[in-house]
Amino acid sequence: MNVTTQGRTRHFRTVTFDRAQNAVRLIEQRLLPHEFKIVATPNFRATAAAITDMVVRGAGAIGATAAYGLAQGALAFRGNDLKKFYVHVETVYQVLKNARPTAVDPVNAMNDVRRHMSPGQTVAERQFLALAAAEEFAREDVRHCEAIGRHGARLIRNGMKILTHCNAGWLAFVDIGTATAPLYAAQVQGKKFHVFCDETRPRSQGATLTAWELAQQNISHQIIADNAAGHLMQRGEVDLVIVGSDRTLGRTGEVANKIGTYTKAVLAARHKIPFYVAIPLSTIDWNLKRGFDIPIEERSESEVLGAWGMVDKSKFKTQNSKLKQRAYVRVANPTSGARNPGFDVTPPELITGIITPVGVLKPQELWPRRRELGFSGQGG
């Protein structure tokens, strides 16, 4: 996606790989929208930490990061012993797999890398195949998002007001995004519409990331408090809801996504507003049979009890230079604790359709069309 920074417009991808340095290059998303910065992780443990600490986040982006991280770890191995190489790669795999448990993209991405590297007869061959597979996963992520945009743009009409939740934009994928892909495609088609970005507490990824993306692309939008969505729906000010997903169950059509998605789905159903989920094929979990079994990440209570932001110097009389920096501010009662589940699960009966690279499907169509959607296993 094109980004204008320091008066210059350039095309960036969220995740890339530096072969010369054997490093994964990432947009430091925790600094947005106040600062645009590229960072490099020099080894697979640093790459896993970047996923855990949310330097990079979003289903496709952490999938590509994990794929590159596995290749990075494989390339760091020194020696020719295939058995020792296998043990090393398995260690790398487990470290990256445990970085964030709810999203399935990292597991699917790394399984793909392992599958493609296995025919290699030597360590060097497997290292080469690992990086080639990671690069192909990243390219496929972009192709899937492009297809989602084409299919999803048909849902958007002139004058629509569209609600989205959290960030399922290009920052959450290698490029383009899922929930935002129909918006970008519709904009290219000349359609005029307005987007409401849920702030998406506690990390405010709608307010910081989605709003920043839409501003970069000159798309009409406003940030709303999470609790305002129902009011706007009740007043007829929302025509369509499009969200992303961190894990969608192929057998049931249940969708795990950022906390608050289920609430928006309930509200949309109450007000008869179409509710769509946009996903690449790598987000589909073909193994789990019920949403209750999806591991829900519990994050630090500090995210709920306070917030990061840029200090507004206009509110202070002092010219202290420290006020130019980002700061964490506690807003909650100092003696209270908090619960911070990062995700919730939306049942299929609340979902109008799932926008996939092969078309817009009903949740119950995923399993019958599993071969077309990339399922390669057995069972029913």
Predicted regions and their residues:
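N-terminal active-site beta-alpha-beta segment that forms phosphate/nucleotide-binding
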Residues: 53-224
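Acidic-glycine-rich active-site phosphate/pyrophosphate-binding loop
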Residues: 35-46, 158, 235-243
